[in-house]
Amino acid sequence: MGGFGALRTGLAYSRNYSKIAALSSALIIHQLRDMKPEDANPMANYAYYANIFGDLQTARERDCNPEVLVRQKLAAGEKLPEIFMACGSEDFLIEPNRAFRDFLKASGVPCAYHESPGIHDWKFWNEYLEPAIAWMVG
């Protein structure tokens, strides 16, 4: 599912989930507004993102943005799932992961955040699968 999908699904359906583990999350929704049809990034191209999020100009203001979901759930007084995040310090997604961690902290949402050397690959994810599972069952 990926880290973004885990966050989006767990937050959107927070009554069904008590914990979310998100590794190397593609939290790039803020960057999509400026994409043009000919643009691409290391993950995908404009058409891919438009197919997933619809109008890229408004995506960051809608509930496809995990930040919007957090704000909505907090405003409604709903309990949020606990969140475990990990991202490699050399991963091209490190800055959006740090920004989301900071957003959660500023919003008063606890987050077990982990960062260590690594890129966006299975070597890094394998390092954090066991700790994430231990955290989930602990």
Label every model-predicted segment:
Residues 1-138:
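Non-catalytic cap/lid and distal C-terminal segments of serine-dependent acyl enzymes
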